[in-house]
């Protein structure tokens, strides 16, 4: 369980650390919103990239709270806590992949997401498939 919590905390704080480092190298104006045709509809400040890592940290603490709460519901053992921690690890991995994708788009000021070889939908649905396999085997 200790090893899983180390992985959990690493995945929880890694995006914040990476974005804080990348902030110095990002252009002042980055694409902040895309429409359904993958075209930029709004440009924003580079500091807007901090929003998603902060949400990731808050989500991580929420999952830790749920793990503690669920462990109290179980009389003996820690299966509920284990499931919550693993679900949190899988979810945080998805968040990290999304943040990496968005940072790549921000660094290159990509105006059309269709020009990136790996589509965000392919990435997320592929990772969701792997997540379902992992969660189904707990």
Task: Outline where the language-model segments fall.
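Feature 926 captures the class I aminoacyl-tRNA synthetase adenylation module centered on the KMSKS loop
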Residues: 2-30, 34-138
